[in-house]
Amino acid sequence: MLIEHEVAFVLHVRPWRETSLLVEVLTQAYGRLGLIARGVQGLKKQTLRAALQPLQWIRFSAIQRGELGQLRQAEALDTAPRLKGEAMLASFYINELLLRLVPRHAPVNELYLAYSQTRERLRTSDSLAWSLRLFEREILETLGVGFNLECDANGTPLDPATRYVLDPLEGPRRLLSEHNNAKRRDTATGHVLLALARNQIPNTNDLAGLRRSMRAVLLHHLGGRGLKSWEMIAAFRHQDTSP
């Protein structure tokens, strides 16, 4: 299959044999693709190598045969965000999440748009934690494993004042005992779950519980094996708060 003048976001790049690269990209029309960029060493290929960087928005042409395609041409369409600190780690996170959870060639229409929006939010570091929760919700929905965030697992409308455990398969379940502090820590309020369902920015105090709840769901779908970016973010936060 010939792919011509398609736009994509670069997710990951790694060496492939001696002079080539394996480039993972996210497209709206074809989903995630793995492309081999051959012979990219040398001064003449400097512009191409510069375009094949994570977060870069590109236009490319390729020949797709089997699992991996052959990249024929690529050019940068804008300047990729220059990130640092938590915003940079967040970019590693969304890219790693896509690579681990989204199979190649699967349809990703809405997820492509969500990635584009999240990329711009990373550029400004605007509501970073909230942006990541929205992206996580979108990736779960794309995979067909999302759930109704307006009602609990029994179909009862969520109570904003109640805390819920997010069951990876069935969705929100009411926390039965408020006295179990260990379980309470890993729950989300009905208020923040409703906000996530309705794209409404919630109270900042609710975001930590939502982060832990969504991570538990994602960890289930990751087969129990966590992400390298989670470890990097945890180390960064520890270093940032250390005396």
UniProtKB/Swiss-Prot annotation:
Record's GO cellular component terms: bacterial nucleoid
Record's function text: Involved in DNA repair and RecF pathway recombination.
Single GO BP term: double-strand break repair
Keywords annotated in UniProt: DNA damage, DNA recombination, DNA repair
Similarity comment: Belongs to the RecO family.
Gene field: recO
Protein name per UniProt: DNA repair protein RecO
